[in-house]
Amino acid sequence: MLLLKQKGKDILCNKKINIRGNHMTGGQLKLLTKMKKLITKGNKKFINRRDRDYLKELLEIGITESLAWQEILTLSSYNYVPDYKPFYLKSDSSLVFKKEINGNRVYIKLKIEEYNNKEMTVCLSFHLDYK
């Protein structure tokens, strides 16, 4: 049983509260930390996919590329969601998040890739969440 405050009253609740969000593994947390360090160093890149133009997607959300990177830097385990259909990547080295931005639920997928012998955080998806 948990003791919770609701409108100034103490109430008992037998629900479990997930304090760590959606349970990122230690390896995933390290990967997210590394991604954020690369972003702050300027080692970051958006990918245009055949089926999506990231600039149009950002415009639809109402943010710039710079603001998108700022939003990515605020991601935590609370925003993490398991990637049940990693169709684009055949590895578990990507991380997927969902976050409210400008009143919209946004789907964000990140990965670290190497470009010109330099590791970069790559944003594979940053668009409205359609699920």
Predicted ranges, named:
Residues 8-10, 15-16, 23-91:
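Compact soluble domain cores
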Residues 87-113:
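Basic/aromatic recognition patch in beta-strand/loop cores that engages polyanionic ligands
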Residues 105-131:
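Enriched for short, Lys/Arg-rich terminal
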